[in-house]
């Protein structure tokens, strides 16, 4: 069985095609196009025509690669920029026509869950509680979990693209602009960092482009073996400031498209290290696309992890499953009468709501 995950991210659009073999997902091909969607928001909060066209042209090329695949084997998702843009629906409708499949705009917590799931399958099995930090173009997901299950997760509205555009828009880098970028990123975490601070987890990992790029640069400069520490980040920050301009940033292994947003990414990562009191962070493969693939595979094989989470909660609190099923059946029948063309996914959410409602009633007795 072949599956495809399409990630309409704030920095880049990505496609991952994989096949399912037993419990394993094996990648057959991956494609990435740097779009910088987050840099294409105008002063009124709308995606500019230029940004939309960049994205739609990339999706047309992606559509060629998924031609012939069953539509229910494909999941396309949008993240923070498409959550925030006032005219995102206009873009989504055009994107769906090109891809010939639904584009789902992920809520922040769902994005965090999928990020953790993708990383958890890529990392060695462990009983330790893990922190995953994923710095994207316009948001940063912080997630704590164990095994393959998220315990706590949130998406913060700060990323490498929007930070770079705001604080290094003239392409100049100074100690002052870097410090402002770090303080701004840290302020976004204010009030929520206590949930993710050291003491709530045993191991810290980072995923996606910023963390991977920083790890590679630190290893190439022989500052570390690829592990990331605050001391190493401060050294890298000083080198970037010394370059004085985005155009003059040069490190072995640094790709051109990553250079554009490296300063913003470093600022966000330093803020995360300071606020969450991280000593050392290692790189985790996986992240959102792999989380989508494993989630999709679970649904196709009737092993949806969300179903398992609801069932575990009902069992833990001895909820009345028969009563929950009766309520769920009535709710779904009413829903299908009112919305005959609604998807099975919508009906599934209603059943979970009935299950969790019954669990809540059990707790309150």
Model segments located where?
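N-terminal basic/disordered segments at the start of proteins
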Residues: 1-27
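Membrane-embedded alpha-helical core segments of multi-pass
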Residues: 135-137, 209
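Helical "lid/coupling" subdomains associated with nucleotide-phosphate turnover
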Residues: 17-20, 40-71, 79-129, 144-146, ...
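N-terminal glycine-rich anion-binding loops that anchor highly charged ligand groups
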Residues: 24-36
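Acidic, divalent-metal-coordinating active-site segment for phosphoryl/phosphodiester hydrolysis
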Residues: 138-144
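Short linear Ser/Thr-Pro motifs
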Residues: 10-12, 139, 284
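Dinucleotide-binding Rossmann-like beta1-alpha1 core, especially the glycine-rich loop
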Residues: 76
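Short glycine-aspartate micro-motif
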Residues: 3-7, 130-134, 204
């Amino acid at each position: 069985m072949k599956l495809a995950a399409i990630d309409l991210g704030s920095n880049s659009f990505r496609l991952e095609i994989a096949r399912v073999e037993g419990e394993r997902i094996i990648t057959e091909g991956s494609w990435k196009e740097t779009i910088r969607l987050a840099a294409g928001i105008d002063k009124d909060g709308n995606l500019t025509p230029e940004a939309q066209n960049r994205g739609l042209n990339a999706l047309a090329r992606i559509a060629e690669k998924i031609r012939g695949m069953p539509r229910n084997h494909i999941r396309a998702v949008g993240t923070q920029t498409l959550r925030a843009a006032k005219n995102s629906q206009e873009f989504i409708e055009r994107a769906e026509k090109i891809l010939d499949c639904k584009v789902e705009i992920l809520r922040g917590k769902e994005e965090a869950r999928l990020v953790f799931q993708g990383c958890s399958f890529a990392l060695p099995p462990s009983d330790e509680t893990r922190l995953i930090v994923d710095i994207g173009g316009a948001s940063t997901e912080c997630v704590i979990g164990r095994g393959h299950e998220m315990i706590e997760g949130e998406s913060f509205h700060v990323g490498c693209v929007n930070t770079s555009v705001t604080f290094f828009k003239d392409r100049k880098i100074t100690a002052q602009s870097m410090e402002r970028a770090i303080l701004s990123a840290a302020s976004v975490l204010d009030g929520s960092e206590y949930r993710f601070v050291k003491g709530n987890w045993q191991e810290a990992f980072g995923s996606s482009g910023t963390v991977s790029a920083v790890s590679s640069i630190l290893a190439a400069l022989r500052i570390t073996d690829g592990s990331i520490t605050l001391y190493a980040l401060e050294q890298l920050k000083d080198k970037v400031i010394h370059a004085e301009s985005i155009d003059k940033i040069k490190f072995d292994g640094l790709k051109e498209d990553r250079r554009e947003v490296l300063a913003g990414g470093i600022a966000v990562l330093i803020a995360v290290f300071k606020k969450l009191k991280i000593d050392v962070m290692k790189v985790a493969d996986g992240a959102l696309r792999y989380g989508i693939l494993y989630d999709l595979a679970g649904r196709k094989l009737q092993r949806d992890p969300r179903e398992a989470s609801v069932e575990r909660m009902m069992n833990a609190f001895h909820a009345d499953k028969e009563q929950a099923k009766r309520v769920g059946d009535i709710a779904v029948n009413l829903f299908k009468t009112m919305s005959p063309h609604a998807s099975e996914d919508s009906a599934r959410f209603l059943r979970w709501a009935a299950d969790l409602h019954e669990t809540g009633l059990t707790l309150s007795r």
